[in-house]
Amino acid sequence: MPPVPLLRLQCGVNSYDWGKVGHESAAAKYAATTAASDFSIQSDKPYAELWMGTHPSLPSKDLETQRTLLDMVQDNQALISQEVSERYGGKLPFLFKVLSIRKALSIQAHPNKKLAEKLHARDPRNYPDDNHKPEMTIAITPFEGLCGFRPLVEIIHFLKAVAPLRQLVGERAASEFENTVKGSEESEDPAVTEKNKQALRTLFTSLMRSSPESIEAATKELVAIAQNSPETFTTSSSTPETNPTNPAELAAITVRLNGQFPNDIGSFVFFFLNFVKLEPGEAMFLKADDIHAYISGDIIECMASSDNVVRAGFTPKFKDVDTLVDMLTYSYAPIAEQKLEPTDYPYAVLNAPAYSSGSSCILYDPPIEEFSVVKTDLKRQGAKATFDGISGPSIVICTAGAGKITVGPKTEEVNEGYVFFVGANAECIIESTGEDTFTTFKAFCDLTGKEDMVNGN
């Protein structure tokens, strides 16, 4: 009889400088619940990312046998399904993570499939994968980040209201941009939108090519304004209709970011990008080539299985400004268009205690084939959700409460931080065993109905 396709996973955690420190880090706490014998949380060490998947940089292991999940799915293709295995080279198509963010991650974008192949061939050390990396972020705790270019009217406002920004991009570049997009900032005509994107590209490139000396001088002035006049920061009496509603908050973030990365171009990129705040359970989706930066919070992140990053600010790591300014799409849109609204998940059945306690199964389903995520909240002891088998693999992590997970004849206890792999086509039942809400996130790949989505598009 084949083994039951339910594996408890041991997952590794990365210690990047931006991670939350010691026991403050959800990534560290979750890793510690199923840790290797040589792992213990150090109180002064940052812990940034818990990785769940088959990516070779930090592969998850089966707790019982200590074999990597990659080995196991390559030995037994049925665990991820023949179709998924053939399409994704015998590996999980997604990488599931928990990020615990204390200070800003780099301003970055992830190359699309075509560019990823080119960058990997040219520079495999800095670009270790040939795959694209669209990704989705779901907040576990309140989250702040930057995501995609702002609407053009907002960028124009900041060019007028933030003197050090205008000084840095240069009067000529600022005026040319304003004159090009004036009166057509919100046009939906494709030809006009394309013209606006090219104007934004020119302006942004001008900013990104600023000299270190001019960045330092402009930053000094910017921070002084933020500290001395927080209530009127980034506002203008001549254009009150476009003033931000939260000037003091923007001033505080400007000071905080400069404290983390002194004299960094990122403090000015901030005025080009949407400032996004997510409450727990809210999500955003980033297409390949979308510019973004995370600032603070604990999040669940799911992405196509790639570790490619093109960085250009808020980082001590390799910066590739030329590639970044060339690769971006320069699409601009309000925050609402970056957020991803979940819907009810139709392939799970809740029992009576689950229904009567207001338990829920909601689906975050981005417009790509590699992954979707279901968040389940079971709000009473004995509340149960039965998930239909799907024709692809799943990884489940518990972020709150206690319960159990059952696949076939096998039942495992589940506590906060526990991670499980569920094989393709297996019905999966989760049940709350405590009084507190039992919360799980389940990342999965099911190609059914996604035949029209071509990899990389």
From Swiss-Prot:
It catalyses: D-mannose 6-phosphate = D-fructose 6-phosphate. Pathway: Nucleotide-sugar biosynthesis; GDP-alpha-D-mannose biosynthesis; alpha-D-mannose 1-phosphate from D-fructose 6-phosphate: step 1/2. Its EC number is 5.3.1.8. One of its GO terms (molecular function) is zinc ion binding. Keywords: Cytoplasm, Isomerase, Metal-binding, Zinc. Binds 1 zinc ion per subunit. One of its GO terms (cellular component) is cytosol. SUPFAM superfamilies: RmlC-like cupins. Its cofactor is Zn(2+). CDD domains: cupin_PMI_type_I_N. InterPro entries: Man6P_Isoase-1 (IPR001250), Mannose-6-P_Isomerase (IPR016305), Pmannose_isomerase-type1_CS (IPR018050), PMI_typeI_C (IPR046456), PMI_typeI_cat (IPR046457), PMI_typeI_hel (IPR046458), RmlC-like_jellyroll (IPR014710), RmlC_Cupin_sf (IPR011051). GO terms for biological process: cell wall mannoprotein biosynthetic process; GDP-mannose biosynthetic process; mannose metabolic process; protein glycosylation. It is found in: Cytoplasm. The active site is at 311. Zn(2+) binds at residues 108, 110, 135, 292. Involved in the synthesis of the GDP-mannose and dolichol-phosphate-mannose required for a number of critical mannosyl transfer reactions. Belongs to the mannose-6-phosphate isomerase type 1 family. PANTHER family: MANNOSE-6-PHOSPHATE ISOMERASE. This is Mannose-6-phosphate isomerase. It comes from Aspergillus fumigatus (strain ATCC MYA-4609 / CBS 101355 / FGSC A1100 / Af293). The lineage of its organism: Eukaryota, Fungi, Dikarya, Ascomycota, Pezizomycotina.
